[in-house]
Curated annotation (Swiss-Prot):
Assigned keywords, A-Z: DNA-binding, Nucleus, Phytochrome signaling pathway, Transcription, Transcription regulation
Organism in which the protein naturally occurs: Arabidopsis thaliana (Mouse-ear cress)
Record region (Helix-loop-helix motif): 148-183
Tissue specificity as recorded in UniProt: Mainly expressed in fruits and flowers and, to a lower extent, in leaves, stems, seedlings and roots.
Renumbered residue ranges of the record's region Basic motif: 134-147
Single GO term (MF): transcription coregulator activity
Gene that encodes the chain: HFR1
GO cellular component, one term: cytosol
Gene induction: Twofold induction by far-red light and 14-fold suppression by red light. Up-regulated by abscisic acid (ABA), heat and salt (NaCl). Follows a free-running robust circadian rhythm, with higher levels during the light phase.
Stated name of the protein: Transcription factor HFR1
PANTHER family for this protein: TRANSCRIPTION FACTOR HFR1, TRANSCRIPTION FACTOR PIF1-RELATED
Length: 292
């Protein structure tokens, strides 16, 4: 009996030992399979697998493959423009073989409020990307064209206004307003004193209107301060205009360089539709000196 018991105890111990060895073997195999799974996942992430091993890998670690696909889908291509508020001047990645196609790589979950352009078709074989133009770029191009047109108009206005040497918009507009006020004052004074405004285009300098108005008023015996009334501009047909009869053209240098008439009678019907020109300061000053 004792021998049988000893033999049974020895067999039981052997069975327990074999079970322990089997458990250790299963644990080591499980650990090796976990390590292989992790290594295979890292290899898949870095592109070490061939196309023939794709099906086997998808059966081994499907979770890692999904994470890699989601990471690829979350990446967006950001093309900065000159009007963009974001300073994306780092993390440049070249997606094509040519070096001139450079885009900025970002994750779309990082800050969704910033402007980005999503890649619509990202084939590895294609060199160019089909992308959607944002509204910010379109607005920036429209604003640029509008600013260029405004700059051209301001340059033309600066050329029309005398003694306007500054190029900024505020200075040009101030000079233009002042110049238009001076022209309005000249028209009002001419209509008040009854001077014939039919002359050639004037050679008036900017700022010489005071001398001209003083000469006009002195020639007609009027006080300029008493006749500067804020009346509206009088049309050209209400002014006494000379007829077209007996118009003589001067030939000598001592005579006036403007048209003269022999009859001071007024005939507005003969000049219907014509716009009068501003008189010259030299003509008015010489006329005033002769009258004095």
């Amino acid at each position: 009996m004792s021998n049988n018991q000893a033999f049974m105890e020895l067999g039981w111990r052997n069975d327990v030992g074999s079970l322990a060895v089997k458990d250790q073997g299963m644990m080591s195999e499980r650990a090796r399979s976990d390590e292989d799974r992790l290594i295979n996942g890292l290899k898949w992430g870095y592109g070490y697998f061939d196309h023939d091993q794709t099906d086997n890998y998808l059966q081994i670690v499907p979770e890692i493959h999904k994470e890699v696909e989601n990471a690829k889908e979350d990446l967006l291509v950001v093309v900065p423009d000159e009007h963009s508020e974001t300073d994306d001047h780092h993390h440049i990645k070249d997606f094509s073989e040519r070096s001139d196609h450079r885009f900025y790589l970002r994750n779309k979950h990082e800050n969704p409020k910033k402007r980005r352009i999503q890649v619509l078709s990202s084939d590895d074989e294609s060199e160019e990307f089909t992308r959607e133009v944002p509204s910010v770029t379109r607005k920036g191009s429209k604003r640029r064209r509008r600013d260029e047109k405004m700059s051209n108009k301001m340059r033309k206005l600066q050329q029309l206004v005398p003694n306007c040497h500054k190029t900024d918009k505020v200075s040009v507009l101030d000079k233009t307003i002042e110049y238009m006020k001076n022209l309005q004052l000249q028209l009002q004074m001419m209509s008040t004193v009854g001077v014939n405004p039919y002359f050639l285009p004037a050679t008036l300098g900017f700022g010489m209107h005071n001398h001209m108005l003083t000469a006009m008023a002195s020639a007609h015996g009027l006080n300029p301060a008493n006749h500067m009334m804020p009346s509206p501009l009088i049309p050209a047909l209400n002014w006494p205009l000379p007829p077209f009869t007996n118009i003589s053209f001067p030939h000598s240098s001592s005579q006036s360089l403007f048209l003269t008439t022999s009859s001071p009678a007024s005939s507005p019907q003969s000049l219907h539709g014509l716009v009068p020109y501003f008189p010259s300061f030299l003509d008015f000053s010489s006329h005033a000196m002769r009258r004095l």
